[in-house]
Amino acid sequence: MIQRHELCKDLVAWVFNNPDQPQSLEGVIKELHTTRASLSQGCKESLGIGPMEVLRNIRLEHVHQALKDPEIRQRLNVKSVEDIRKHYGFQSRGNFAAIYADYFGEKPYATMKRASKTSIPN
């Protein structure tokens, strides 16, 4: 169980340390030198959710940060919610907006708009 718990920690660390890398489950499994079953069981034991949901939640956090921070958008060369959504691998516009709103309590466009109102010009 300790090894599976460590796999989940490694998954979270890898995704946070590689935010600009494509983050497919198969790619992460390969990076972590593990199996889908071990990673799945480790995530469920540690966090109560599967690795796909872990990946999705972390990607949502990355999206949220990019929507709030113009410096991140500039570094990634993305300008719109649509660009950010695509950059982080969310395929369906409608599904993405619904998932984002459930997770953060507001639509992605509202996050970006609110952030632009509160940012202080240089």
Q: What is each residue range found by the language model?
A:
Residues R4-V12, R56-H64:
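Short, leucine-enriched amphipathic alpha-helices that occur as contiguous helical runs
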Residues H62-Q74, V78-K79, D83-N122:
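…primarily DNA-binding HTH/wHTH and HhH modules…
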Residues Q3, D20-Q21, L55, L76-N77, ...:
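Helix-turn-helix/winged-helix DNA-binding modules
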Residues E26-E61, R85-K107:
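Basic/polar phosphate-binding segments, predominantly the helix-turn-helix DNA-binding elements
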Residues D10-Q23, C43, L47, Q65-V78, ...:
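Basic, amphipathic alpha-helical hairpins
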